[in-house]
UniProtKB/Swiss-Prot annotation:
Keywords: Cell membrane, Membrane, Transmembrane, Transmembrane helix. This is UPF0391 membrane protein HCH_04387. It comes from the Bacteria. One of its GO terms (cellular component) is plasma membrane. It is found in: Cell membrane. The chain crosses the membrane at residues 6-26, 30-50. Its main location: membrane. It is a multi-pass membrane protein. Belongs to the UPF0391 family. It comes from Hahella chejuensis (strain KCTC 2396).
Length: 56
């Protein structure tokens, strides 16, 4: 039980450091950009798969 309390304490410290510094804002911007890129790639793959099935 002591082990898990120490693990959660360390996780809370890391989350606090990332949350209270500017690192969180920078990573959020990167995550938004990556989300849009992968969303576009997903839509393209669905459209390309639809065209491929129509040929068979």
């Amino acid at each position: 039980m002591l082990y898990w309390s120490i693990v959660f304490f360390v996780v809370a410290l890391v989350a606090g450091v990332l949350g209270f510094t500017g690192i969180a804002a920078a990573t959020a911007d990167i995550a938004q950009i990556l989300f849009v890129i992968f969303l576009v790639l997903f839509v393209i793959s669905i459209i390309a798969g639809g065209f491929r099935r129509n040929r068979l």
